[in-house]
Amino acid sequence: EIDTAAAFHVSRTPVRDAFKMLEREGLLEVRPHIGTFVSLIDLNMISDILYLRETLEQAVLRDLTAGYDKSQEFRIRLLLQRQCGLLEQDLPAEELGRAFIINDNEFHTTLYELAGKRTVMDFLTGVSSQYERFRTFLNLGDRDNLLRLYNDHIKIWSCISSRDYEGLSDVVSHHIYDGFNASTEIISRHPDYFCPFH
């Protein structure tokens, strides 16, 4: 606390409040009389968040598909064009990853908004701090994974606009879990960043 307050030229109170919030979200570990540490990425929590996200996203996107209206297409096509444009640029891997994640979040938020379920997305965002860390870690240097996500987004929208419920269910499951399932190599290269499954 003291070092952080000094670095930002603020009193300890706002730093303490920020640390408490980060601790509640599982991002910091406070050990009294020892120090404050960035927590490990909790794979158990991420697995639970993915389960929650898949369950909710399947329901929200089914609702969106049932009420699909051609007028909704403009916003989604614009976001998909932005994603494609990012992938076509020769950006450094970290910059591309960060920009794509922002656009990815906007894509999913827009789907929830079009389905009239923005509050559901706000809830998911509120419980997804560990997942966001993990996702950022996975995507910062992996252009191929970003391309896979973009292609998934195209498939998701194609299924919605053609009212292909079965295809939508399949692509959403893969979209949510494939990155996590493919992360074993990264986890094995950086085991000190992760809490093991239990």
Across the structure, where does each feature detected by a protein language model lie?
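Short linear motifs at protein or domain termini
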Residues: 1-66, 119, 180, 184-198
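Short, flexible segments with low predicted structural confidence
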Residues: 17-21, 31-32, 47, 82-83, ...
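Residue-level recognition of short, well-ordered coil/turn positions
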Residues: 27, 91, 142, 164-165
